């Protein structure tokens, strides 16, 4: 008796997620060929389409294994299967050309050079030995070279580089790790490096290997070189050369702001900073962010110039993430050269990173002594990402850009197609539809035409790559923000204007997957946010969900002399705080001594008559004021300088002193602020709020200073006082509302000491604490909150 014949079946499988440009089709091909199945795989605008045919058991095995071990850069977010009629085909499984059709897929971020490519780079016997653009399906640029979707070479900035026969063979071989690697190249087919010296430097232009050798020699000689990377230009110099670092700092007008440092390898990084296992993992990850680390007190064999990160216990380190970086820092056998380089964004302070080659020669003229450039265009600017690692091993991203963008975030509620324009500082837009949101790259400040042009370019690029056509715009409520005016010009009708601190809280809620059915206690501390009453907010505790909020507590307002321009003068902020608290400007007080007699007279008149003095409840401004009062920072050369110096001082006394300065916590009726929101059934909403009055803090601080208490102790006691005030108010709120989830958000919570202490006190009190992780707590994460508030309105209307 013969066994029954098993009829073949055919199954159509659609895979969604980050599945293009990552070697997913060769992976599918190997699976199918290993099971002797027939059919095909193809890229489409929706993801990857597979049709597979063969014995039912083998087709089932194929489907089961499909998501078990995908390529390293792949992320599968959805798999759809349906049976279709078998065709009776018997040929081999094939990889078909990409289908051109409307739809959406996910492009991976740019990733660091993989170990296999690094081995080829260093191997004299390999045809890509010292090739500055070596890459494969497991590494290299993606987002910054993509000009459209689906992701194929014609839709990248590699379209102008025809493949040589050898590269074409690799590109077409499913068994090769360069199969359909769109940026694949070699010395024969380009791109090519070039070194362009500044006029009068006495150095001749060079190409290829000579360009790299000349750039290394210039860096070793103390020169500043503009280096074109994947997402823009860096300005580089030898980080151990005090004169070179001082020159770069002076040319860039950077004040005392710390520089990031690129180390040749992990061993070098370990000599400069103390690394935990989690910090080591972040530093060596494919994302290759800048990681903020504790500096070693006595570095082993490598000493950074003092001006790299002056007066800071931390240093931002990153490792090479392109072959150009690896070659600049030197391969074994190369002539001696710097093993640590300052790598700072190629721009003047306050401007966006430069990406265009012609612009680089003009905008960076006077900053760089030479340009190490290449002829592969950059489709979108993408600055380095920045993060710190908490003691528990979790990450707090402070700038979300290269290595993260355009990876989508999963949303807890569906949103209408919406574009949120963020804020004017640390600008990053957010585009969303359905249950996904995409951040654009970090743009920075929108204070000039270059910043606005970069934001518009980022918007066009992200819209093109995601396939989202926004129908709604969301923006900050501040009427003077460039980002708000930009939203009004998008042609999407009147933008939905979202209060600044409500957006911060909504951003954290979305990151943690909260659906908003239960409000949270949102602690939103920053320097500046436009308040409902037209004043400057920033020391806020709100009851909030996505539909609205109620202002529960605030920092006692004080005048902000000169408005936004006064922020650069912490000494004036300090004196305004003393004035608001009824405390005298005593001779010998650091903030008084920092001002001229004329300045003091004008400031006194301003405060008395209320001239150009907008009230502010900004917690960030209080940190600035205290920094001046203890004698640390009176004139800020960059954003948050005063607060950073205060945190650095507090760190040195943190374990030795456990004191805390007490805030006055008083009930306040008519606190003002809020929008209609859905009060949960059975929950009470406080009719009145509280005020956090810093007058007792200031009195205690001045008393301790008169007793010659060390500045670090003063700083530590202030930090603990803020944390205890927050914990006290959150406990009171729980007692009155029954709410138990607290969100910590806003730029002030980038302060590691404050965030850790506040979270610890709240956790001890039995409250659930949500902190930012992949989404920045500062204005770099603002657009996600705007998106959620505006984009979910239709969802809430149907409930």
Residue spans of the language-model regions?
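A contiguous, well-structured pocket-lining segment that forms one wall/lid of small-molecule binding clefts
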Residues: 190-191, 424-453, 457-459, 576-615, ...
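Conserved phosphate-binding catalytic cores of ATP/NTP-utilizing and phosphoryl-transfer enzymes
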Residues: 270-276, 327, 353-358, 384-385, ...
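Short glycine-rich phosphate-binding loop at a beta-alpha junction
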Residues: 226, 467-479, 737-748
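Conserved phosphate-binding/catalytic loops in two-lobed NTP-binding clefts
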Residues: 493-504, 740-745, 752, 758-782
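Intrinsically disordered, low-complexity, mixed-charge
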Residues: 1-183, 187-194
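Internal gly/pro-rich beta-alpha loop/helix module
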Residues: 69, 154, 170, 332-413, ...
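A phosphate-binding glycine/aspartate-rich beta-alpha loop in the early core of alpha/beta enzymes
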Residues: 83, 232-297
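Glycine-rich phosphate-binding/hydrolytic loop that grips phosphoryl groups
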Residues: 501-525, 530-531, 570-579, 770-799
